[in-house]
Design a protein with these regions (language model features):
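Anionic-ligand binding patches
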Residues: 2-5, 11-164
């Protein structure tokens, strides 16, 4: 089976994906130099990554957004260096993590989108240095996953979506 190309360039993230998808050969390639997308929706951001990356194999990319339950994006507020970003108001505000994976099974094939949603809250402080992205900031509710299957203790909030 040829390797599936993960368009990201983050080897720690690739290790997480290899753990979630054992047995699937995975190659990691960085996003193109200068790549940028201003798409507000994670589905379009993930699709843009796949469309912008010239690969001669099946490939996928992911995009994540974190919102309040009424849809207000927390991405910019929590991604900043603002020291108040973990204030009590944020910690007590219910949040929803959206993950979209854009998959192109072969060169020229249509792009498929798989979406996962998990409800929870913002962490009191970021998790340690070996936890990536939103997993550092988001604490899932015990029954917060809106996808197939249950995630294990070692699996990130996005493991359900990737496994689909």
């Amino acid at each position: 089976m040829p390797a599936l190309v993960f368009i990201d360039g983050n080897e720690l993230r690739a290790q997480e994906i290899r753990r979630i998808l054992p047995g699937i050969p995975l190659a990691v390639e960085a996003l193109q130099t200068g790549f940028s997308t201003s798409a507000p929706e994670p589905a379009q951001r993930a699709r843009d990554k796949v469309l912008a990356h010239p690969v001669a194999a099946g490939c996928f990319a992911e995009a994540v957004d974190l919102t309040t339950l009424d849809g207000k994006s927390l991405r910019l507020e929590l991604d900043s260096e603002n020291e108040n970003r973990f204030c009590k108001w944020w910690r007590e505000t219910p949040a929803r993590l959206h993950l979209v994976v854009a998959l192109r099974r072969a060169p020229g094939a249509e792009i498929e989108l798989v979406t996962g949603v998990c409800e929870g809250r913002i962490a009191d402080q970021p998790a340690g240095p070996h936890v990536l992205g939103w997993d550092r900031l988001f604490v899932p509710a015990p029954d917060g996953a809106a996808g197939e299957g249950d995630k294990g203790d070692e699996e990130g909030d996005d493991g359900i979506t990737l496994a689909q």
